[in-house]
């Protein structure tokens, strides 16, 4: 039996139960895989208080950065603006993704060891009504 390794960036602990489940191959054409996928999709719609056929959920594989980039580049409209609260590499990366993709953004940056302030976020939102996200 193969002993798969889960290679992920960042500080992360993978439990033995997750590692055990990883030993089973799920193939996209198998009925159990399809059932798992459909259950996840329905659950995501329910969490958003929406339903088919007006809405759907598409599962995408990728890193956390990939997930954030997919949202920023597909959800934010041309006439909308994102407020990025940055206090580290991930926030800097999100602002850079916005700039590279042509997504309007305002960056509220704090030192890497400082928690962003809810008061300052409110001030940014009040000062700039074009911020929509």
Can you name each region flagged by the protein language model?
Residues 21-70, 74, 89, 93-99:
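Conserved N-terminal alpha-helix of the aminotransferase class I/II PLP-enzyme fold
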């Amino acid at each position: 039996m193969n002993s798969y390794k889960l290679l992920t960036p960042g500080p992360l602990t993978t439990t033995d139960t997750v590692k055990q489940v990883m030993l089973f191959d799920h193939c996209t054409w198998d009925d159990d895989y399809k059932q798992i996928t459909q259950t996840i999709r329905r659950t995501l719609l329910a969490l958003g208080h929406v339903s088919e056929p007006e809405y759907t959920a598409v599962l995408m594989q990728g890193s956390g950065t990939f997930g954030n980039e997919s949202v920023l580049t597909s959800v934010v409209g041309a006439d909308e603006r994102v407020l990025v609260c940055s206090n580290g590499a991930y926030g800097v990366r999100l602002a850079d993704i916005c700039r590279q993709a042509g997504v309007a953004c305002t960056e509220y940056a704090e030192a890497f060891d400082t928690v962003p302030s809810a008061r300052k976020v409110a001030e940014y939102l009040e000062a700039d009504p074009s911020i929509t996200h």
